[in-house]
């Protein structure tokens, strides 16, 4: 009787304990589901707030510092036609005869207004001029020497280490001689303009005889559809037969423009031949190294990629109790 009473009390305590555990589990699951339902809402609110702050910051920045304006074809200028320049090909170089003709066009036409302040006389040797021609050309100009004992600066003939002289003493003199417009330096003009050689060639050959109907040209400007705004201070400078080439090449407008553009491209990038040679060497070496790396990878990892793994679990012996039961039954 006492044993039954103890057993009943134990069952009652166990059932109460299970009920309490289930209630606690149910309440915990309810809380977790509520938290899970609230967490996406909080994340969405936080994401929306962060997006609003970022968009507001960008809008405020552009309100303070940004400037947006519509661009018309007349304001932007016509896009230059793409021309097949030979020196832009991978395995081609400059035409040295064209460089010599282009330098002649620059000296006789462009040098009166535009400078080449980054090109020394020594860079012309072996590419455009001989050593004697470059020395004679340098000696035609005078350069300042170092101050002497009395502090006076004297003049000396130019040397190969000197740079091509500027046509004006300073920017103010250049603006005064060109109605307020400052002629740009042509040392890097090909690299500094969108379109490069195509743009410079189109600009030099794009002057019409008369502005088209409806085109407005400001005072002191010339119409050129390739220049942004179509109004340029530089007038047309290339005409047929303007230059007498030494090699007898007909000096048409397009020929002179082509030669001077190729010369200006060389002036902006005289190391183009070295760069192309270095690029070819890099491509050859990297190709060989890549082929070797592929071979070594396949050779080293072939055994790992071709191996087969078979799962063979160990077989466990039958339990000893199963073997002993028949013997016990036989004895009984």
From Swiss-Prot:
<keyword id="KW-0812">Transmembrane</keyword>
<feature type="region of interest" description="Disordered">
    <location>
        <begin position="139"/>
        <end position="162"/>
    </location>
</feature>
<comment type="subunit">
    <text>Component of the ubiquinol-cytochrome c oxidoreductase (cytochrome b-c1 complex, complex III, CIII), a multisubunit enzyme composed of 10 subunits. The complex is composed of 3 respiratory subunits cytochrome b (cob), cytochrome c1 (cyt-1) and Rieske protein (fes-1), 2 core protein subunits pep and ucr-1, and 5 low-molecular weight protein subunits qcr6, qcr7, qcr8, qcr9 and probably NCU16844/qcr10.</text>
</comment>
<dbReference type="InterPro" id="IPR009056">
    <property type="entry name" value="Cyt_c-like_dom"/>
</dbReference>
<feature type="transmembrane region" description="Helical">
    <location>
        <begin position="278"/>
        <end position="296"/>
    </location>
</feature>
<keyword id="KW-0408">Iron</keyword>
<keyword id="KW-0479">Metal-binding</keyword>
<comment type="function">
    <text>Component of the ubiquinol-cytochrome c oxidoreductase, a multisubunit transmembrane complex that is part of the mitochondrial electron transport chain which drives oxidative phosphorylation.</text>
</comment>
<feature type="binding site" description="axial binding residue">
    <location>
        <position position="234"/>
    </location>
    <ligand>
        <name>heme c</name>
    </ligand>
</feature>
<keyword id="KW-0472">Membrane</keyword>
<keyword id="KW-0999">Mitochondrion inner membrane</keyword>
<dbReference type="GO" id="GO:0020037">
    <property type="term" value="F:heme binding"/>
</dbReference>
<keyword id="KW-0813">Transport</keyword>
<keyword id="KW-1133">Transmembrane helix</keyword>
<dbReference type="InterPro" id="IPR036909">
    <property type="entry name" value="Cyt_c-like_dom_sf"/>
</dbReference>
<dbReference type="GO" id="GO:0006122">
    <property type="term" value="P:mitochondrial electron transport, ubiquinol to cytochrome c"/>
</dbReference>
<dbReference type="GO" id="GO:0008121">
    <property type="term" value="F:ubiquinol-cytochrome-c reductase activity"/>
</dbReference>
<dbReference type="GO" id="GO:0045275">
    <property type="term" value="C:respiratory chain complex III"/>
</dbReference>
<feature type="transit peptide" description="Mitochondrion">
    <location>
        <begin position="1"/>
        <end position="70"/>
    </location>
</feature>
<dbReference type="GO" id="GO:0046872">
    <property type="term" value="F:metal ion binding"/>
</dbReference>
<keyword id="KW-0809">Transit peptide</keyword>
<dbReference type="Pfam" id="PF02167">
    <property type="entry name" value="Cytochrom_C1"/>
</dbReference>
<keyword id="KW-0496">Mitochondrion</keyword>
<dbReference type="InterPro" id="IPR002326">
    <property type="entry name" value="Cyt_c1"/>
</dbReference>
<dbReference type="GO" id="GO:0005743">
    <property type="term" value="C:mitochondrial inner membrane"/>
</dbReference>
<dbReference type="InterPro" id="IPR021157">
    <property type="entry name" value="Cyt_c1_TM_anchor_C"/>
</dbReference>
<keyword id="KW-0679">Respiratory chain</keyword>
<feature type="compositionally biased region" description="Acidic residues">
    <location>
        <begin position="139"/>
        <end position="151"/>
    </location>
</feature>
<feature type="binding site" description="covalent">
    <location>
        <position position="113"/>
    </location>
    <ligand>
        <name>heme c</name>
    </ligand>
</feature>
<comment type="similarity">
    <text>Belongs to the cytochrome c family.</text>
</comment>
<keyword id="KW-1278">Translocase</keyword>
<feature type="topological domain" description="Mitochondrial matrix">
    <location>
        <begin position="297"/>
        <end position="332"/>
    </location>
</feature>
<feature type="binding site" description="covalent">
    <location>
        <position position="110"/>
    </location>
    <ligand>
        <name>heme c</name>
    </ligand>
</feature>
<feature type="domain" description="Cytochrome c">
    <location>
        <begin position="97"/>
        <end position="250"/>
    </location>
</feature>
<keyword id="KW-0249">Electron transport</keyword>
<protein>
    <recommendedName>
        <fullName>Cytochrome c1, heme protein, mitochondrial</fullName>
        <ecNumber>7.1.1.8</ecNumber>
    </recommendedName>
</protein>
<keyword id="KW-0349">Heme</keyword>
<feature type="topological domain" description="Mitochondrial intermembrane">
    <location>
        <begin position="71"/>
        <end position="277"/>
    </location>
</feature>
<feature type="binding site" description="axial binding residue">
    <location>
        <position position="114"/>
    </location>
    <ligand>
        <name>heme c</name>
    </ligand>
</feature>
